[in-house]
Amino acid sequence: MVEPLLSGIVLGLIPVTLIGLFVAAYLQYRRGNQFEF
């Protein structure tokens, strides 16, 4: 009974996590270019 809900949560969280990591890396990359470290 809990497995479909759990798998749904995991399947929903994985793309959000990947997008969050990508955005964080992109912002860090932009900030690094801005200050030219």
UniProtKB/Swiss-Prot annotation:
Location within or outside the cell:
Plastid, Cyanelle thylakoid membrane
| Tagged with keyword RNA-binding | no
Looking up InterPro entries in the UniProt record yields: Cyt_6/f_cplx_su5 (IPR003683), Cyt_6/f_cplx_su5_sf (IPR036099)
Molecular functions (GO terms): electron transporter, transferring electrons within cytochrome b6/f complex of photosystem II activity
A single Gene Ontology biological process assigned to it is:
cytochrome complex assembly
What subunit structure does UniProt give?
The 4 large subunits of the cytochrome b6-f complex are cytochrome b6, subunit IV (17 kDa polypeptide, PetD), cytochrome f and the Rieske protein, while the 4 small subunits are PetG, PetL, PetM and PetN. The complex functions as a dimer.
Q: What does this protein do?
A: Component of the cytochrome b6-f complex, which mediates electron transfer between photosystem II (PSII) and photosystem I (PSI), cyclic electron flow around PSI, and state transitions. PetG is required for either the stability or assembly of the cytochrome b6-f complex.
Do you know which NCBIfam families this protein is assigned to? PRK00665.1
What is the recorded name of this protein?
A: Cytochrome b6-f complex subunit 5
Query: Organism source for this protein?
Result: Cyanophora paradoxa
Q: What is the lineage of its organism?
A: Eukaryota, Glaucocystophyceae, Cyanophoraceae, Cyanophora
